[in-house]
């Protein structure tokens, strides 16, 4: 039987693509803005 090779960690996921991390940079804010415009229920990983 094969092993699962991709096992993500919650801490890294939040640090890389959490809401507060996105808000720190201009491009990150653009990501949030685009997701708001599209009407996404979850704007980032750490929300919802």
From Swiss-Prot:
Q: Name the InterPro entries on file.
A: Ribosomal_bL34
Signal sequence region: none
Transmembrane helix keyword on record: no
The terms under GO molecular function for this entry are:
structural constituent of ribosome
Q: Which Pfam families does the entry mention?
A: Ribosomal_L34 (PF00468)
Keyword Ribosomal protein assigned: yes
GO cellular component terms given for this protein? ribonucleoprotein complex; ribosome
Any one of the GO BP annotations: translation
Alphabetical UniProt keywords: Ribonucleoprotein, Ribosomal protein
The record's HAMAP family line, in alphabetical order, gives: Ribosomal_bL34
State the family it belongs to: Belongs to the bacterial ribosomal protein bL34 family.
Q: By what name is this protein known?
A: Large ribosomal subunit protein bL34
